[in-house]
Design a protein with these regions (language model features):
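Gram-negative and organellar
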Residues: 1-188
């Protein structure tokens, strides 16, 4: 068993800038399985809308399982829950959340590693929206297809296709969105 903490200077700087505090516990019961618990606390600040300033707290479990066979395939599951509470007393912006992430990663060949992910999250607000007179309830589904490829010793490129469907009780929050994202990561 091992307690992991953010100790690198870059992670500490990032956490201070983002207002994030986190902790993680990780346990490897055998060479093919990894279990974990984590806690995250975010301080959300909105420059133009200070009424939305909030604290978001999330607790979760993680399980990663390396499948036998070719491709170095790894299955990942992550149930989580939490709440977001505004600093002002506004029940319309106060909500509880619960979700589940499932993922699969696999070597694709020629240096590429693919990933497939599904995420479901439910958010239940505590007070009625003043404009609509109803309590907001969201059920969001994200589907992600991506890959990563090393373009240097510590540099990776990550193209991803993400589709989001948010079912909401309030029409302005009910939407579909598809995004093509490409990011470049430097691993310290």
């Amino acid at each position: 068993m091992e307690v992991l903490r953010a100790v690198s200077q870059t992670e500490v700087i990032r956490d201070v800038l983002l207002g994030l505090r986190s902790g993680q516990w990780q346990f490897d019961p055998d060479p093919r399985n990894q279990l974990g618990l984590y806690a995250q606390v975010f301080r959300l600040d909105f420059d133009d809308q200070p009424l939305r300033d909030a604290r978001r707290t999330v607790l979760g479990l993680t399980w990663a399982h390396a499948l036998a066979g070719p491709g170095n395939t790894v299955f990942i599951a992550n149930p989580y829950g939490g709440q977001e509470s505004p600093r002002q007393s506004l029940p319309v912006l106060d909500f509880r959340l619960a979700g589940l992430r499932l993922g699969l990663q696999r070597d694709l060949g020629a240096g590429w590693r693919g990933n497939l992910g599904v995420q479901w999250e439910e958010r239940r607000h505590r007070g009625p929206d003043p404009l609509f007179g109803r309590i907001r309830h969201d059920r969001q589904l994200d589907l992600r297809l991506g890959a990563e490829y090393p373009i240097g010793p510590r540099l990776l490129i990550n193209p991803q296709l993400l589709h989001t469907r948010n079912h909401a009780t309030l029409a302005p929050n009910d939407f579909r969105r598809t995004q093509l994202l490409v990011d470049v990561q430097y691993r310290w």
